Amino acid sequence: MPEPAKSAPAPKKGSKKAVTKAQKIDGKKRKRSRKESYSVYVYKVLKQVHPDTGISSKAMGIMNSFVNDIFERIAGEASRLAHYNKRSTITSREIQTAVRLLLPGELAKHAVSEGTKAVTKYTSAK
């Protein structure tokens, strides 16, 4: 009777970095699939704001889900705006308008100013 294949140990939940180790299953090497997440960036921002504070893997999962959700909402709204204006390209203007439509009051103002600052920094570095 053949033994059931043993699953490989699960990767640590903290920071979901890319794993390049190969697993051996039935004598064949198989690479682990890469899990993309924003955990590295969330951690960097946390350390900028509160250097002495940590974050649990569950909280990191929630933050990752939140960033993905906001990204999809902004991208969807920007896509709709480009379509309404018969444009085939989403520019920073569509993103800015989408942010103004999606985020409430003061939060939208701060997001727009931070976004403008980031775009300026990026274009000046080119």
From Swiss-Prot:
Stretches the record annotates as Disordered: 1-36
Key word Calcium present: no
First-listed, main subcellular location of the protein, grouped into a coarse class: nucleus
Record-listed N6-butyryllysine modification sites: K6, K21
Residues the record lists as PolyADP-ribosyl glutamic acid modifications: E36
GO cellular component annotations of the record: nucleosome; nucleus
GO molecular function annotation: DNA binding; protein heterodimerization activity; structural constituent of chromatin
Modified-residue entries (N6,N6-dimethyllysine), positions: K58
Phosphoserine found at: S15, S37
Posttranslational modification: Monoubiquitination at Lys-35 (H2BK34Ub) by the MSL1/MSL2 dimer is required for histone H3 'Lys-4' (H3K4me) and 'Lys-79' (H3K79me) methylation and transcription activation at specific gene loci, such as HOXA9 and MEIS1 loci. Similarly, monoubiquitination at Lys-121 (H2BK120Ub) by the RNF20/40 complex gives a specific tag for epigenetic transcriptional activation and is also prerequisite for histone H3 'Lys-4' and 'Lys-79' methylation. It also functions cooperatively with the FACT dimer to stimulate elongation by RNA polymerase II. Phosphorylated on Ser-15 (H2BS14ph) by STK4/MST1 during apoptosis; which facilitates apoptotic chromatin condensation. Also phosphorylated on Ser-15 in response to DNA double strand breaks (DSBs), and in correlation with somatic hypermutation and immunoglobulin class-switch recombination. Phosphorylation at Ser-37 (H2BS36ph) by AMPK in response to stress promotes transcription.
Function summary: Core component of nucleosome. Nucleosomes wrap and compact DNA into chromatin, limiting DNA accessibility to the cellular machineries which require DNA as a template. Histones thereby play a central role in transcription regulation, DNA repair, DNA replication and chromosomal stability. DNA accessibility is regulated via a complex set of post-translational modifications of histones, also called histone code, and nucleosome remodeling.
Name of this chain's protein: Histone H2B type 1-K
Originating organism: Bos taurus
Lineage, broadest ranks: Eukaryota, Metazoa, Chordata, Craniata, Vertebrata
